[in-house]
A protein has these predicted regions:
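Small cysteine-rich, disulfide-bonded extracellular modules of the LU/uPAR three-finger superfamily
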Residues: 1-128, 135-170
C-alpha cells in the first residue's frame, strides 16, 4: 500500500497541488559478519505531520521533524496516530534536504531526509514499528510505519534508518 496525501495550496488565484509521501530505508548490519540487510518501505504521513509541514511552510512553527522513535507495537497505522503503540525510545538527528529534479512525469519536488544510527547497545528489542517525531516525548508523531518484517535487534547489530519526506507538485 502506498500512502500519499494531497495538499492544495492557493495563492492569488493560482493553485498548486502537492503530494506528500514518506519512505524508510532500514539497513541492518551484523557487526560480527559484516553482512547488511536492507529493507525499504513506504509509510504514513499523519494528520499531525501534515499540519507540521504546513506550519513550517507558513512560518507559524519552526519546530522540525528530527526524532526517530522505535516501538514494539503492531496496530495498523492510521491518519490520526500521534504516538507509537509501545515506544522503546528515540534519537534526535540532523535533517538534510535535497532538490529532486524529477519523480517521473516531469514533476519536480523536494526531498528531506533524516538519517539515524542505532549502535549495538541501543533499543535491543524486536522492532515492529517506527515513527518520526518533533520532540520524541509526546503526542507529536508526524509519520508512522508498522514494519512488514519485524527486526530482532540484538547487540550483534547496528541499524541505520534513513527516513525521507518527499513533496512533489502534481
Amino acid at each position: 500500500m502506498i500512502y500519499m496525501r494531497d495538499i492544495l495550496m492557493r495563492v492569488d488565484n493560482m493553485e498548486t497541488n502537492l503530494k506528500v509521501y514518506c519512505e524508510a530505508v532500514i539497513e541492518v548490519r551484523n557487526e560480527e559478519t559484516g553482512e547488511i540487510e536492507t529493507y525499504r518501505q513506504r509509510n504514513l504521513v499523519t494528520d499531525y505531520g501534515l499540519t507540521k509541514i504546513l506550519q513550517s511552510v507558513t512560518g507559524i512553527d519552526t519546530t522540525i521533524i528530527s526524532r526517530c522513535a522505535i516501538g514494539t507495537g503492531s496496530t495498523p497505522t492510521d491518519w490520526s496516530d500521534v504516538l507509537l503503540d509501545n515506544q522503546d525510545g528515540s534519537r534526535k538527528q540532523r535533517v538534510e534536504t535535497e532538490m529532486v529534479t524529477s519523480f517521473g512525469g516531469g514533476a519536480a519536488g523536494k526531498k528531506v531526509w533524516i538519517k539515524t544510527f542505532f549502535n549495538r547497545t541501543e533499543h535491543n528489542v524486536v522492532w515492529r514499528e517506527m515513527g518520526m517525531f518533533t520532540t520524541g516525548i509526546g503526542a507529536d508523531c508526524c509519520s508512522r510505519i508498522v514494519l512488514t518484517t519485524p527486526i530482532n535487534k540484538t547487540s550483534d547489530y547496528t541499524i541505520t534508518v534513513t527516513w525521507s519526506y518527499i513533496i512533489v507538485s502534481s
